[in-house]
Curated annotation (Swiss-Prot):
Residues 318-330 have a biased composition (Polar residues). Coiled coil: none annotated. This is Putative neutral sphingomyelinase. It comes from Drosophila melanogaster (Fruit fly). It is found in: Membrane. The chain crosses the membrane at residues 362-384, 391-413. The gene is nSMase.
């Protein structure tokens, strides 16, 4: 029996005030597209300006009358949800690690990033929509935020598990800054047992060649672009969720203009929910995929869903299934205990490396503070030449300020980040230790 049908859309709108190009005309164009009535639930990221949030809500209220913006940090979390159906409850969970406050040019810390939950009532069924925007990757060769994203991914998976309750469907839609081969993607998908609505190499959502905002360097680095914007799905008990369609629905350019809607591509998934009769001897919650790929062919995949354990017999039978690559299939088809264990072990190794680096950083900051303190004492004892007193006084204030910064980074900030990483590491160890023995509960 068909319970409901939903069109879910996610888009990073690139709405950074004074930085993002063509921001106002792009927001207007996005409003017009969302007001077309094609989408039932919309998950937006990087809505950093209050005026943009209000414009998006007001411009779409005729077809998406229910909305919620998640406030957090200095600038707001940048997360906005628009819905055709009533939003009965909301909850925001801030991540324990989220970049560095002194990296002003990156600004992730100021957003107070986390995962936002909207409990939406659709046709008598409770749907949980999770909106998230993981920490950005600024340097692929030297990614100092990799551990932060891994912990954010694991934290998000645990948040989804802890809050899913008796919801018929859980949807995570957002900019996860993680490609399918990345460890943060694997940790999130394998530990949450969600399904990626896309598994086709033909889709890219960022740094795309046709996007007007893709730089020449990005095109040279990734000629085809990357896929970091995702819609993950997980069915509730006694529910079969069919992913009927996956596509990038927006045109390449804003109509009548030479620029794109955003530096990211919008992603849409069409979902159908069916009620299943529970069976005591078989798993009951499933995810079924039956959707079109780019060349027009179809594929069908059934995935064990939210509340089900994978027994050894299930695992063995799955090994005889042919590998299917299609628009709606997912690497989470392989999210068996072995794959989850491998992902967690890799994540734990990253956490250990980060903890060692934090210890080294603490020593370096204290050493720098000690050296600068000696320099400050010498400056105090030194008599400034005539005409140089103002400069010397300013120099003393600068040195004193740097000393305070080094002491803060070596003590308060170092312990804050250490505890954040340590908490994530301990939580992963708990799952790794108990998951295989108590697989039913994971």
């Amino acid at each position: 029996m068909l319970l409901l049908e939903l069109n879910i859309l996610t888009l990073n709108i690139w709405g950074i005030p004074y930085v993002s190009s063509d921001r106002r005309p792009r927001i207007d164009a996005i409003c017009k597209e969302l007001a077309s009535g094609k989408y039932d639930i919309v998950s937006l990221q990087e809505v950093w300006a209050q005026e943009d949030s209000e414009l998006l809500q007001k411009g779409t209220e005729a077809v998406l009358p229910h909305s919620h913006y998640f406030h957090s940090g200095v600038m707001g979390a940048g997360l906005l949800v628009l819905s055709k159906y009533p939003i009965l409850g909301t909850l925001f969970h801030a991540w324990s690690v989220n970049g560095y406050f002194h990296r002003i040019q990156h600004a992730d810390w100021f957003g107070g990033k986390g995962v936002g939950l909207c409990r939406i009532l659709v046709g008598g069924q409770m749907v949980h929509l999770y909106n998230a925007h993981l920490h950005a990757e600024y340097d692929n060769a030297n990614d100092e935020y990799k551990t932060h994203r891994v912990i954010q991914a694991f934290d998000t998976a645990q948040f989804i598990e802890a809050t899913r309750g008796n919801s018929a469907l859980q949807i995570l839609a957002g900019d996860l800054n993680a490609q399918p081969q990345d460890i943060s993607y694997k940790v999130l998908l394998y530990t949450s047992k969600m399904l990626d609505s896309c598994d086709s190499d033909s889709f890219r959502t960022n740094e795309c060649e046709h996007n007007s905002y893709t730089s020449k360097q990005a095109r040279e680095r990734n000629p085809l672009g990357i896929r970091i914007d995702h819609i993950f799905v997980r069915g509730g008990d006694h529910v079969n969720a069919e992913i009927a369609e996956y596509k990038l629905p927006f045109p390449e350019r804003v109509p009548g203009e030479k620029f794109s809607f955003s530096d990211h591509e919008a992603v849409m998934a069409k979902l159908k929910l069916f009620k299943l009769e529970p069976r005591s001897e078989e798993p009951v919650a499933t995810i079924e995929v039956n959707c079109l790929v780019e060349d027009g062919e179809t594929c069908s995949v059934r995935e064990v869903g939210a509340g089900d354990a994978l027994t050894g017999e299930d695992d063995q039978s799955s090994q005889h299934q042919p590998e299917i690559q299609c628009n709606g299939s997912s690497t989470s088809i392989q999210s068996m205990p072995a794959a989850r264990t491998a992902a967690l072990l890799e994540a734990l190794a990253l956490c250990d490396a980060s903890l060692l680096q934090l210890n080294t950083d603490r020593i370096l900051y204290y050493s720098a503070a000690t050296f600068l303190f000696v320099l400050l004492v010498l400056l105090v004892e030194f008599t400034a030449p005539v005409g140089m007193r103002t400069i010397f006084l300013l120099l003393k204030f600068i040195v004193f300020g740097v000393i305070l910064f080094c002491v803060f980074m070596a003590s308060i900030w170092n312990y804050m980040e250490r505890n954040g990483v340590l908490q994530g590491k301990k939580s992963m160890e708990v799952m790794l230790h108990h998951a295989q023995k108590y697989e039913y509960f994971y």
